[in-house]
């Protein structure tokens, strides 16, 4: 099969939107039931990596894959077990929803989802949507986010047998050991299940060199180990020809050290973090007819963590427990040709308990109602939605936050100027807000229950094109988007007379450009070359007060220039992949002065892999070399990343 970055975009299009990529490129491709987002014809920016692309790129972690999306800032605290969160177009990680098999993952305490919790081994696709999705057959919670990272897990592929099996072992530098197992069984033509289990451990004791002003610091990261278990069970039932039911159970348990920031002449670190996360979710769908369908989901999530430390003043131990109950239903209808509507209703209940002094034991009740409409014409498509949000909270002690009500509109348009061409123009607008987290509202001393929601407005205009380029390329796809964002009532910590306090004092303006390019060339028989490139320009400025010394300063941890790229060469003997992720200079604090500057970096990696097949068995061998430059660059100041490191992965499939 030829390498085709962006083939997913072609497969997702209908007949009127198809792109001629030639019989040679399409030979051997199989269209599955799961249709991925058609980024080329979307009214809002959508970027997708499917399993085949991830394997060709040699990517082994979710965080490494996300780096290839334009507009993304990955906050990485380093090491195998370091916290990794995703911010899109400088809005902050709290504005990025993370969905797992279509159901949102919530964290009412911090509002941030650590994507290092998820494995790439059982993932079928990663999709980043910025703004409002063209898919109106979705949950109301999806409409309530400024952007969304959707993680879809693999469904069983049985072919000519009633079971499938995949075993994988990864090992590498710093004591990495990461075995995993995926097994699926088909009981009947209508009932099947899958099981996935994984163990991860690493010492994380890597050497680093960094500068402290003018003095070099050399040492090893201490207390940077991790031990984690992941397990997942799925049940897939086709109740009738029109009804499906999926049930999922998930478990994550980890123990890790928190090395903290590097302190000159003080390598001591003893903080430990223990995490347990369990959830169960189900999805039901009924396709009543070609004009009506309904899907509903339910989820219960339990999250517990313990933070311990051995300080000079004495040991500390804090425990946190949060739960979430989530119910959602979406009705979709197309009463007349080319016009469709949807109505989605979500209910969310959250609660938090901690061992901290004066814990207020907050509870939150959220109702989200989204009405959407879409009109599709061969030359253009218009999508509009209106989201109604109502939130009320209760606390056992102290003052609860006020009730919140808001209507949030969104609209997108895509236009095809030439009917037989794959060139499109698009524009979108979305008004949305994020509610303060429980930490923002109720955390000991710094919490402020009078906080207002953080409001955002997003504008995007862009163009996309995909197709053949004659002798230039067998396949080429290009998207260019310019955008402007406003954030009002930004929630930040500000100093008071005695302590820091969360307050609504910030306003941020962001404008930028995202560019995505993918191409494929057939060099000779069984020789293929693929290329991807992503570039982002992002000017995110503090415009809170004209008289402030921070006026028009770039906000912290937001590079003006960043990007990623990849080359894949497929040959009859071995395949090679080269990937690079780079970031320009950033500032660690709001004030843009030299002492706050974090250097630019580029992370280069190379993968070599070969797949052997014999009598229904498949064996894949892969060797990776990451951070070839060996630089201990910093994504977060004083948290140096590992230098040059290596991984070996062996995968057996049956």
Regions inferred by a protein language model and the residue ranges of each:
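N-terminal periplasmic "start-of-domain" segments of outer-membrane beta-barrel proteins
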Residues: 23-55
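Membrane-embedded beta-barrel scaffold of Gram-negative outer-membrane proteins
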Residues: 291-307, 425-428, 454-511, 516-520
């Amino acid at each position: 099969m030829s390498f085709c970055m962006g083939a997913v975009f072609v497969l997702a299009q209908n007949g009127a939107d198809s792109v001629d990529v030639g019989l040679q490129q399409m030979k051997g491709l199989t269209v599955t039931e799961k249709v991925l987002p058609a980024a080329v014809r979307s009214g809002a920016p959508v970027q997708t990596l499917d399993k085949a692309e991830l394997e060709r790129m040699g990517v082994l972690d979710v965080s490494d894959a996300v780096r290839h999306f334009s507009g993304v800032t990955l906050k990485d605290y380093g090491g195998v077990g370091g916290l990794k969160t995703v911010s899109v177009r400088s809005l902050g990680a709290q504005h990025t929803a993370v969905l797992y098999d279509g159901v949102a993952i919530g964290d009412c305490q911090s509002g941030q989802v650590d994507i290092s919790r998820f494995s790439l081994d059982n993932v079928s696709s990663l999709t980043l949507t910025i703004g409002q999705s063209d898919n109106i057959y979705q949950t109301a919670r999806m409409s309530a986010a400024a952007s969304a990272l959707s993680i879809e897990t693999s469904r069983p592929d049985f072919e000519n047998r009633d079971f499938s099996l995949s075993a994988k072992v990864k090992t590498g530098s710093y004591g990495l050991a990461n075995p995993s197992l995926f097994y699926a069984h088909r009981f009947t033509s209508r009932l099947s299940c899958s099981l996935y289990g994984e163990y991860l451990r690493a010492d994380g004791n890597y050497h680093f060199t960094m500068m402290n002003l003018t003095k070099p610091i050399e040492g090893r990261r201490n207390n940077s180990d991790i031990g984690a278990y992941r397990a997942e069970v799925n049940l897939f039932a086709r109740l009738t020809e029109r009804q499906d039911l999926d049930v999922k159970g998930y478990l994550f348990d980890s123990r890790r050290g928190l090395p903290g920031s590097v302190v000159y002449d003080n390598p001591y670190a003893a903080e430990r973090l223990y995490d347990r996360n369990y959830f169960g979710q189900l999805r039901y769908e009924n396709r009543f007819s070609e004009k009506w369908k309904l899907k509903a989901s339910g989820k219960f999530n339990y999250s517990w963590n313990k933070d311990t430390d051995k300080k000079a003043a004495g040991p500390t131990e804090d425990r946190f427990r949060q739960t979430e109950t989530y119910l959602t239903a979406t009705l979709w209808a197309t009463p007349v040709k080319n016009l469709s509507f949807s109505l989605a209703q979500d209910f969310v209940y959250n609660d938090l308990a901690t061992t901290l002094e004066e814990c207020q034991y907050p509870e939150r009740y959220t109702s989200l109602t989204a009405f959407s409409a879409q009109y599709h014409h061969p030359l253009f498509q218009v999508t509009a939605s209106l989201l109604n949000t109502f939130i009320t909270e209760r606390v056992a002690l102290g003052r609860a936050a006020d009730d919140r009500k808001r209507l949030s509109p969104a609209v997108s348009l895509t236009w095809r100027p030439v009917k037989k061409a794959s060139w499109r123009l698009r524009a979108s607008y979305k008004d949305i807000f994020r509610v303060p987290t429980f930490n923002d509202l109720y955390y000991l001393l710094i919490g402020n229950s009078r906080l207002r929601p953080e409001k955002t407005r997003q504008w995007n205009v862009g163009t996309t094109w995909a197709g053949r380029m004659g002798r230039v390329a067998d396949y080429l796809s290009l998207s260019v988007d310019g955008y402007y964002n406003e954030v009002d009532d930004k929630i930040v910590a500000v100093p008071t007379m005695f302590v820091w306090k969360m307050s609504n004092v910030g306003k941020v303006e962001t404008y930028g450009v995202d560019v995505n390019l993918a191409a494929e060339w057939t060099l000779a028989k069984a020789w293929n070359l693929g290329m991807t490139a992503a570039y982002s320009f992002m000017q995110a400025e503090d415009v809170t007060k004209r008289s402030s010394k921070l006026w028009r300063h770039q906000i912290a941890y937001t590079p003006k220039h960043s990007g990623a790229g990849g080359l894949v060469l497929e040959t009859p003997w071995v395949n090679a992949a080269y990937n690079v992720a780079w970031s320009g200079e950033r500032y660690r604090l709001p004030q843009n002065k030299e002492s706050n500057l974090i250097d630019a970096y580029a992370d280069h990696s190379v993968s070599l892999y070969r797949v052997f097949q014999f009598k229904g068995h498949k064996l894949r061998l892969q060797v990776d070399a990451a951070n070839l430059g060996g630089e201990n660059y910093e994504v977060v100041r004083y948290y140096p990343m590992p230098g040059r490191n290596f991984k070996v992965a062996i995968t057996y499939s049956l």
